[in-house]
Amino acid sequence: MAQFFKAKPNSSKQLSAKQSFSVHQLDHLGAGIAQHQGKVVFIPGALPSETVQAQLTEQKKNYARAKLIKVETPSAERVTPLCPHYQSCGGCDLQHMSLAGQREHKSAALVDIMAKFAGAEGNSVPALTGEGWHYRRRARLATLFDKNTKQLSLGFRASSSNQVVPIDSCLVLAKPLSDLIAPFAKLLNQLAAKSSLGHLELIDADNGHFAVIRITKSLNDKDMAKLAQFAEQHQIHICLQDNNGEFHGVNGTLLLPVYQLLDDKADATPVSLTFTPGNFVQVNAQINKAMVAQALDWLAPQPGERILDLFCGMGNFSLPLAKLGAEVIGVEGVPEMVSQARENAAANGLSNLTFYHGDLSADLSCEPWMGKIDKLLLDPARAGAFESLQWLKKMKPRQVVYVSCNPASLARDSAVLLERGYKLQKLGLIDMFPQTHHIEAMALFELAK
């Protein structure tokens, strides 16, 4: 049979052409969704109900991606981003949408993902919301040393890039920390070791403000004196982290950051949690308190109950649960955080609380310390708790509270719980990161009788 040459469409011309798109919704990553020639097109920066001009940047079999060029018909939810670094910084990717619009989108996306991938429809509860700006109590800034100008800049990574975007302030960082960025940049440029400095971590704790400077070689006495003087002038605790991961206070003493929980409850004394810079801590203090309070309300811990807290970290949920009378078993995969959790329990005088280091993907049901479990709290990383749920079916806790930072893994894991006889009773958004697309959630499951 004769073979005839047939020219393929000029894909490069299709990609370079600017076209008009009608956006009808957002995906769970905050990108606008449009239809074009039978394909779904994802357009970051576009909002529902908008007509936009965009340029195709990627063509796949079933979808395409495009770069927003111009908004022709703006949405009523579109606002002018307040941050001068918005276009280049990779952090706050929904600043162009009103705060109310962001929360409405996130709540709807959460319900949609759970219904679509888990077949679960829970009793939606009001979202946990707080301040839209200056809510972060912790941030890590990258350093960029220019070999030509011999100048060091502080900033955040650009979107989908390792490039550092220099900044002098941050509107989602706690105001006292944001105000320290420019002075710190000036200070670090005065150090002889500025070319060997790593990241700068800023922390706003209940016992003061903290800064951690990553160093790759020891600082001389003059540099140390400058840091100590800056710390005194700005009333901030500065420590250095060396190549071995050890921390050293610039004034000779090392003070660790602390935050409190239950300090707003009239019927309970507060618990204090100390944490080491570098270890995980929820960055939104206001929402973390609300999240812990909601988990306590849903689980209603009682004396005599045994509650298992998986992925317990340094005790963010474990200590408050134990404070209200339940016997709590906390399991964590990071040894350093288990040690910190044990120290926190001892410092708060809690004896009804034990912590264990364990591989959370392995079967822990046969461990001698496990025993009968009445209720379960899960707070996994983005990957979820799929492996853990495989052995938890043997435990059959009456209630499961699942705290999630990824709705996709929550939906997948929810399907497992539903198959095992649990019913989704409550589902709610946790708006931990306003101005960004990130969706966090809490779900309550109860074993069907």
Curated annotation (Swiss-Prot):
InterPro entries noted in UniProt: 23S_rRNA_MeTrfase_RlmD, MeTrfase_TrmA_AS, MeTrfase_TrmA_CS, NA-bd_OB-fold, SAM-dependent_MTases_sf, TRAM_dom, U5_MeTrfase_fam
Q: Name one GO molecular function term.
A: RNA binding
Q: Which residues form the active site?
A: C405
The EC class name is: transferase
Q: Name one GO biological process term.
A: rRNA base methylation
Instruction: Cite the entry's keywords alphabetically.
Output: 4Fe-4S, Iron, Iron-sulfur, Metal-binding, Methyltransferase, rRNA processing, S-adenosyl-L-methionine, Transferase
List residues binding [4Fe-4S] cluster. Answer: C83, C89, C92, C170
Stated EC number for the protein is 2.1.1.190
Q: Which annotated residues bind S-adenosyl-L-methionine? A: Q282, F311, N316, E332, D359, D379
> Which reaction is recorded as catalysed by this protein?
uridine(1939) in 23S rRNA + S-adenosyl-L-methionine = 5-methyluridine(1939) in 23S rRNA + S-adenosyl-L-homocysteine + H(+)
Query: Which residue intervals define the domain TRAM in the entry?
Result: 12-70
Physiological role = Catalyzes the formation of 5-methyl-uridine at position 1939 (m5U1939) in 23S rRNA.
Family affiliation: Belongs to the class I-like SAM-binding methyltransferase superfamily. RNA M5U methyltransferase family. RlmD subfamily.
Question: What's the protein name?
Answer: 23S rRNA (uracil(1939)-C(5))-methyltransferase RlmD
Origin species, per record, is Shewanella sp. (strain MR-7)
Q: Which gene encodes it?
A: rlmD
